[in-house]
């Protein structure tokens, strides 16, 4: 119940969990506040400080790093802030590196609020960030034209080397 209530509290507080919300959850569940705090600080999906209207999470786990996640991080540093978790002056956007978001097959990728942006490179990432900073909603999904997680280059099997 703690994780679900933390998730709800985060949704109700502009994507972060204030201390008052954690204390309320502890009281509601009749458990020590420190236990709620332990859960909130253990999982990276909970934000304990304001993150902005647009919260960009760049996966930097091994599959994404091998495929160029460092270029996505460079784009975030150029467009949003040199430092992770630092809000833009208008408080509209922040970014951070995160552990696996579960879209390894379409690496490298990032999540902005609830949407996944996959098969990215630096140029595509910069364009997406430009759009969100203008208040626009870029199209989520693959930026190589793949549908879901279909193979690239029309490969049908692992042995299909001619299309590799």
Predicted regions and their residues:
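Signature of N-terminal electron-transfer/Fe-S-associated modules in redox systems
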Residues: 1-164
């Amino acid at each position: 119940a703690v994780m679900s209530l933390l998730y709800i509290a985060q949704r109700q507080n502009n994507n972060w969990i204030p201390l008052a919300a954690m204390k309320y959850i502890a009281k509601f569940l009749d458990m020590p506040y420190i236990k709620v705090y332990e859960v909130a600080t253990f999982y990276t999906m909970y934000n304990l400080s304001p993150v902005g209207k647009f919260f960009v999470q760049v996966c930097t786990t091994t599959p994404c790093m091998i495929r160029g996640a460092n270029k996505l991080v460079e784009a975030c540093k150029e467009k949003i802030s040199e430092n992770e978790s630092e809000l833009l002056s208008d408080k509209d956007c922040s970014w951070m590196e995160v552990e696996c978001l579960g879209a390894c097959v379409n690496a490298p990728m990032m999540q902005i609020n609830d949407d996944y942006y996959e098969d990215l490179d630096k140029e595509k990432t910069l364009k997406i960030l430009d759009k969100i900073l203008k208040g626009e909603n870029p199209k989520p999904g693959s930026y190589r034209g793949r549908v879901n997680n279909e193979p690239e280059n029309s490969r049908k099997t692992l042995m299909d080397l001619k299309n590799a």
